[in-house]
């Protein structure tokens, strides 16, 4: 099984890259975010690889990090989610944002993925909510905030700040994560305006 490839970028296709490794061109399918982050043809690149072997074909999937590859595997443990859908999800949400979306039970964020309807998004959030911490990609502050929101215990300033950031165009997971960090910095008595200001600062990093 191929676990990693290091070579020279030969060319790009719609959803794949041809990686030249010592004269052999490997066609590696990647999420759009991964393809966008790779260098120009002629430059060196390294990809973590997931190898799929079928009766009629061998298919390679490439990732910039091992964490991204682990998410690819984890997503496919969900009913109705195959390799194509898993790549689409990772094209829409990077691992950290996906982890936060699941922790916050934000089905809408996952459902923004092309080809993922409300039912599949709900399955992803429901079936993976207990597995997310194992990947250590989710912010503990977001998990705590998620529980507070679910139990209607979150301060009004926190929920108002999240709504304000969402209205500014940020996704729910990003907004919640930023406000969670802001709340941890400013303290439990922070006002909405302060949380928004600190949240925007966090989002600009």
From Swiss-Prot:
- Identify the stretch(es) annotated as Domain II: 65-143
A single Pfam family it belongs to is RuvA_N
- Known InterPro entries for this protein? DNA_helicase_Holl-junc_RuvA_I, NA-bd_OB-fold, RuvA, RuvA_2-like, RuvA_C, RuvA_C_sf
Keywords from the named record: Cytoplasm, DNA damage, DNA recombination, DNA repair, DNA-binding
List the subcellular locations.
Cytoplasm
Provide the residue span(s) of the region labelled Domain III.
154-205
**Chain segments carrying region Domain I:** 1-64
BP-aspect Gene Ontology terms? DNA recombination; DNA repair
- TM segment ranges: none
GO CC annotations, alphabetized: cytoplasm; Holliday junction helicase complex; Holliday junction resolvase complex
Q: Where does the source fall among the domains of life?
A: Bacteria
Q: Describe its function.
A: The RuvA-RuvB-RuvC complex processes Holliday junction (HJ) DNA during genetic recombination and DNA repair, while the RuvA-RuvB complex plays an important role in the rescue of blocked DNA replication forks via replication fork reversal (RFR). RuvA specifically binds to HJ cruciform DNA, conferring on it an open structure. The RuvB hexamer acts as an ATP-dependent pump, pulling dsDNA into and through the RuvAB complex. HJ branch migration allows RuvC to scan DNA until it finds its consensus sequence, where it cleaves and resolves the cruciform DNA.
Q: Which HAMAP family match?
A: DNA_HJ_migration_RuvA (MF_00031)
> Quaternary structure per UniProt?
Homotetramer. Forms an RuvA(8)-RuvB(12)-Holliday junction (HJ) complex. HJ DNA is sandwiched between 2 RuvA tetramers; dsDNA enters through RuvA and exits via RuvB. An RuvB hexamer assembles on each DNA strand where it exits the tetramer. Each RuvB hexamer is contacted by two RuvA subunits (via domain III) on 2 adjacent RuvB subunits; this complex drives branch migration. In the full resolvosome a probable DNA-RuvA(4)-RuvB(12)-RuvC(2) complex forms which resolves the HJ.
- Record protein name field: Holliday junction branch migration complex subunit RuvA
Which source organism does the UniProt entry give? Rhodopseudomonas palustris (strain TIE-1)
Gene from which the chain derives: ruvA
């Amino acid at each position: 099984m191929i676990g990693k490839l290091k070579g020279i970028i030969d060319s790009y296709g719609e959803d794949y890259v041809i990686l030249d490794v010592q004269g052999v061109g490997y066609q590696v399918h990647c999420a759009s975010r991964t393809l966008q982050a790779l260098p120009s043809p002629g430059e060196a690149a390294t990809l973590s690889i997931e190898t799929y072997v079928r009766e009629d074909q061998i298919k390679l999937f490439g990732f910039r990090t091992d964490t991204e590859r682990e998410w690819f595997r984890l997503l496919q443990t969900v009913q109705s989610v195959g390799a194509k859908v898993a790549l689409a999800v990772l094209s829409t949400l990077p691992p950290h944002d996906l982890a936060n979306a699941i922790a916050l039970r934000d089905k809408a964020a996952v459902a923004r993925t092309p080809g993922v309807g409300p039912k599949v998004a709900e399955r992803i959030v429901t079936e993976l909510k207990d597995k997310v911490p194992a990947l250590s990609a989710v912010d503990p502050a977001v998990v705590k905030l998620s529980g507070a929101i679910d139990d209607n215990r979150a301060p009004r300033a926190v929920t108002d700040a999240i709504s304000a950031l969402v209205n500014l165009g940020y996704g729910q997971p990003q907004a919640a994560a930023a406000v969670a960090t802001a709340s941890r910095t400013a303290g439990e008595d922070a006002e909405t305006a302060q949380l928004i200001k600190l949240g925007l600062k966090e989002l600009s990093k």
